[in-house]
């Protein structure tokens, strides 16, 4: 069983309020860039054989040098991302498909992960690969701690309260059988249809394949706002 991982690392951190369009993946946690921790997890995952990174054009050489100096041998390609996250993932998928076009050359699974989620564990990655191959698709998540409400037709008022026991906060890496993800992205590109995560594409184009839930703890956070930095430092220390 083997998988290729796509790391989406093109975000410029608008909500992080970083000057000059600096990438949040390059912020340091525990003395290393966020994306260093991300790449190390996939380097240590036994089921992952290759890693593709989509990033800003200005960061391509920097990330290639970082991977080389850290000894991350699984990093095969660092390419320019697209306008939207989905475009960045599609750029990588096309490269994977072109490079593994022979009969039987596709990996068993493709994983898509946010570059700004540095604390996924290698054993969790391997579990997601296994469940993706078994079920077709597998997405990690955890249960919300807060009550979730709809916003009403009047955006200043709540509309309804959702049943919290039926909700999950979705994370990455999201895993899929390779052919399924490639086909879903290809069809979405043809239609010009965009979603906020890759699982939504598979749900749309492969409705007969329910997406498997893989429940994680609360360590697999995404670095998004300034308040996440001290939380990330605490998680890093706890995981040492």
Curated annotation (Swiss-Prot):
A single Pfam family, by name? IspD
> Site: Positions MEP for the nucleophilic attack. Where?
164, 222
> Superkingdom of this entry's organism?
Bacteria
Q: Which GO terms describe its molecular function?
A: 2-C-methyl-D-erythritol 4-phosphate cytidylyltransferase activity
Q: What InterPro entries has UniProt attached to this entry?
A: IspD, IspD/TarI, IspD/TarI_cytidylyltransf_bact, ISPD_synthase_CS, Nucleotide-diphossugar_trans
| EC code | 2.7.7.60
Q: Which reaction does it catalyse?
A: 2-C-methyl-D-erythritol 4-phosphate + CTP + H(+) = 4-CDP-2-C-methyl-D-erythritol + diphosphate
Tell me the Gene Ontology biological-process terms attached to this UniProt entry: isopentenyl diphosphate biosynthetic process, methylerythritol 4-phosphate pathway
Its keywords, alphabetically, are: Isoprene biosynthesis, Nucleotidyltransferase, Transferase
Query: To which pathway does this protein belong?
Result: Isoprenoid biosynthesis; isopentenyl diphosphate biosynthesis via DXP pathway; isopentenyl diphosphate from 1-deoxy-D-xylulose 5-phosphate: step 2/6
Which residue numbers mark the site Transition state stabilizer?
Answer: 15, 24
> What family does the Swiss-Prot or TrEMBL record give for this protein?
Belongs to the IspD/TarI cytidylyltransferase family. IspD subfamily.
Q: What does this protein do?
A: Catalyzes the formation of 4-diphosphocytidyl-2-C-methyl-D-erythritol from CTP and 2-C-methyl-D-erythritol 4-phosphate (MEP).
Entry protein name: 2-C-methyl-D-erythritol 4-phosphate cytidylyltransferase
Give the species this sequence originates from: Chlorobium luteolum (strain DSM 273 / BCRC 81028 / 2530)
Q: What is the lineage of its organism?
A: Bacteria, Pseudomonadati, Chlorobiota, Chlorobiia, Chlorobiales
């Amino acid at each position: 069983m083997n998988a290729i991982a796509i790391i989406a690392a093109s975000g410029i951190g608008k909500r992080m309020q970083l000057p000059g369009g600096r990438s949040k993946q390059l912020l340091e946690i525990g003395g290393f860039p966020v994306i260093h921790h991300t790449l190390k997890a996939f380097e240590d995952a036994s089921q992952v054989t290759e890693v593709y990174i989509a990033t800003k054009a200005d960061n391509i050489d920097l990330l290639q040098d970082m991977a080389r100096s850290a000894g991350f041998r699984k990093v095969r390609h660092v390419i320019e991302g697209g306008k939207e996250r989905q475009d960045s993932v599609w750029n990588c998928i096309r490269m994977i498909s072109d490079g593994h076009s022979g009969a039987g050359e596709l990996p068993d699974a493709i994983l898509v992960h946010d570059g700004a989620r540095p604390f996924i564990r290698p054993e969790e990655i391997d579990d997601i690969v296994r469940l993706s191959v078994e079920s077709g698709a597998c997405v990690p998540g955890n249960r919300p701690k807060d009550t979730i409400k709809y916003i009403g037709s009047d955006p200043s008022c709540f509309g309804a309260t959702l049943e919290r026991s039926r909700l999950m906060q979705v994370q990455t890496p999201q895993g899929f059988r390779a052919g399924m993800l490639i086909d879903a992205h290809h069809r979405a590109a043809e239609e010009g249809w965009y979603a906020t995560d890759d699982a939504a594409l598979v749900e749309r184009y492969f409705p007969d394949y329910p997406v498997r839930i893989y429940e994680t703890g609360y360590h697999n956070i995404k670095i998004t706002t300034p308040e996440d930095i001290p939380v990330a430092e605490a998680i890093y220390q706890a995981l040492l």
